[in-house]
């Protein structure tokens, strides 16, 4: 009996230690619209460019918070639940970027729909920490996103930028540096624990 109680205590303590402190994550940030990706390696916080890419930001937020229906790739049925929580970073390349947002975990999945690009004049891949939509050609955005760790000017006008990392770029650096296979997939899964969204007024 005492042994079982001790095990339960340890599990409870671990769960409390793993609790996500949303206030701490967004503390100290100026007025704006933000998202945070909580991972095994730490938390990545980025500003959402709602003015420059309104459709893209709304799509990301609605999927993240479970406000939008998407097609489960395994059942073929439409579901309405939090999309990104529990997904992995399925593609990581050192000195380039980390990619996530595939419900199948192999880069071939999406939400079951596509939408058009949003290119805002002057918003380019001129710095690390750009958050953008992955695609397979013009106007094929869905749910997959990537975060850069270096300037990537060759991606200008090819991928919609909808955010900029403001905290946790070092976390992205850690993720892109993990051992990976020939497809650039991490040998040990890097999970998204939760995606948070916060508007600071």
Where are the regions that the model predicts?
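Sec-dependent N-terminal signal peptides
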Residues: 4-13
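Cyclophilin-like peptidyl-prolyl cis-trans isomerases
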Residues: 15-201
């Amino acid at each position: 009996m005492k042994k079982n109680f001790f095990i339960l205590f340890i599990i409870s303590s671990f769960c409390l230690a793993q609790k996500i402190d949303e206030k701490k994550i967004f503390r100290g940030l100026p007025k704006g619209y933000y998202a945070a990706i909580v991972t095994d390696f730490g938390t990545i916080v980025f500003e959402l460019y709602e003015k420059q890419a309104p459709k893209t930001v709304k799509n990301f937020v609605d999927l993240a918070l479970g406000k939008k229906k998407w097609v489960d790739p395994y059942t073929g049925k439409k579901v309405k639940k939090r999309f990104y929580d529990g997904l992995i970073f399925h593609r990581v390349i050192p000195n380039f970027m980390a990619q996530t947002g595939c419900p199948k975990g192999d880069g071939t999945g999406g939400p079951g729909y596509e939408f058009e690009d949003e290119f805002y004049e002057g918003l380019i891949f001129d710095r690390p920490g750009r958050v953008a939509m992955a695609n397979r050609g013009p106007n094929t955005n869905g749910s997959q996103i990537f975060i850069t760790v270096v300037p990537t000017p060759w991606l200008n006008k090819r991928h919609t930028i909808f955010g900029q990392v403001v905290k946790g770029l070092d976390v992205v650096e850690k993720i892109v540096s993990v051992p990976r296979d020939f497809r650039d997939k991490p040998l040990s899964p890097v999970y998204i624990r939760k995606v948070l969204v916060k508007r600071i007024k």
